């Protein structure tokens, strides 16, 4: 907790008006005569309520890979959104995209993100144990920042190279206002500075 406190930068974001788009997906299925009737949707919605992308798939299969299909559709929605918004917010973690997706999908995602460098991954939960493992930490990183801080701000930038040099994940834990729950913000690439994350916090403050 002491280490987490020393890694924390106090920062109160100032709202900056940008055209942001949020992307999320959902899926559902029900058993039907020995098969599964399923549906998957992915949407991209701008902060003013305009729907940029609305994708739907459905079918009848014996063993549909719905989570993978939902992820693919999120990437499709992201591809269609990067040119139409200043900032594209992906719900969830970049780790899960790289860990559970096939190589072609990961490559497609990397190409989409690097096109405009305006894609940000935001998650409300995190199981990563990267920052304090050399201190014998047993809980996830987010646990220590939650206990060490209540002020708005963000943690020291952490760069993870486990997926290779073209898939480096840079992340911080952040709090937008005092006593709010932490969120995790992930960007693709390396070499980011504190100011880069301050700009993002200003843009996502609503």
PLM regions and their residue ranges:
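Long, contiguous domain-sized segments
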Residues: 1-13, 18, 50, 66-206
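Short hydrophobic beta-strand that contains or immediately precedes a catalytic carboxylate
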Residues: 20-23
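Acidic, metal-ligating active-site segments
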Residues: 25-63
């Amino acid at each position: 907790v002491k280490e987490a406190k020393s890694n924390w930068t106090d920062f109160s974001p100032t709202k900056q008006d940008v055209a942001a788009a949020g992307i999320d997906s959902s899926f559902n299925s029900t058993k039907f005569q020995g098969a599964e009737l399923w549906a998957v949707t992915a949407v991209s919605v701008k902060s003013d309520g305009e729907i940029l992308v609305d994708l739907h798939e459905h079918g009848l299969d014996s063993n549909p890979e719905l989570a993978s299909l939902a992820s693919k559709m999120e990437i499709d929605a992201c591809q269609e959104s990067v040119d139409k918004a200043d900032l594209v917010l992906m719900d969830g973690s970049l780790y899960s995209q790289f860990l559970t997706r096939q190589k072609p999908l990961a490559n497609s995602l990397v190409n989409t993100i690097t096109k405009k460098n305006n894609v940000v991954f935001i998650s409300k939960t995190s199981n990563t144990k990267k920052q304090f493992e050399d201190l014998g930490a047993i809980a996830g990183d987010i646990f220590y920042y939650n206990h060490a801080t209540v002020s708005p701000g963000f943690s020291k930038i952490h760069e993870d190279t486990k997926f290779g040099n073209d898939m480096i994940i840079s992340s911080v834990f952040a709090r937008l206002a005092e006593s709010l729950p932490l969120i995790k913000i992930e960007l693709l690439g390396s070499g980011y500075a504190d100011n880069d994350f301050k700009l993002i916090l200003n843009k996502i403050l609503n």
